[in-house]
């Protein structure tokens, strides 16, 4: 039995205004998290829970997967990393050698502890303070390939989920 993984979308867009890009990132991540048994957290987003009721989108079955996550207490709006997220892991195509972890070793961690996987939104990815804070850095491709945010949102939970099925 594995512990729970949380996909943490870190807002590196505008921290003051609630943009369409924020809404679409949540709408894209919710069905992926639902499908692959991940929690979803948004960090440093300029919104409240009520704002999420107004996400009208054709992505994610019109928001039904986000609603499912909310109803099951598997969606979090946070301004800092919560202890229940477990081990903080930054997802990056340029992992620091001393913090580098493979996808397989990430799954092995999940046998004993929950993990929180940060994904940076926007062109700049995760800021240096988050990279320093994280215990590990995961390059999901293991090849240094930089993935577009939406691609990473899909690939990371999928890879972790399917690898966990092979142990």
Where are these regions (language model features)?
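Membrane-topology and secretion signals of cell-surface/extracellular proteins
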Residues: 27, 31, 126, 134-136
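Short, Lys/Arg-enriched, disordered terminal segments
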Residues: 1-3, 105-108, 112, 166-167
């Amino acid at each position: 039995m594995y512990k729970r993984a949380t996909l943490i979308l870190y807002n590196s867009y505008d921290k003051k205004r609630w943009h369409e890009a924020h809404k679409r990132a949540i709408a894209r991540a919710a069905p992926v998290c639902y499908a692959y048994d991940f929690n979803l957290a948004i960090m440093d987003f300029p919104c409240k829970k009520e704002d999420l009721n107004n996400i009208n989108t054709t992505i994610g079955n019109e928001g039904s997967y986000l609603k499912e996550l909310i109803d099951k207490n598997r969606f979090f709006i946070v301004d800092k990393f919560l202890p229940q997220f477990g081990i903080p892991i930054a997802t990056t195509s340029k992992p620091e050698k001393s913090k580098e972890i493979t996808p397989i070793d990430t799954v092995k961690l999940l046998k004993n502890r929950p993990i929180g996987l940060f994904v940076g939104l926007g062109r700049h990815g995760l800021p240096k303070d988050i990279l320093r804070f994280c215990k590990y850095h995961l390059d999901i491709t293991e090849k240094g390939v930089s993935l577009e945010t939406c691609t990473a949102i899909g690939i990371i939970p999928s890879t972790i989920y399917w690898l966990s099925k092979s142990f």
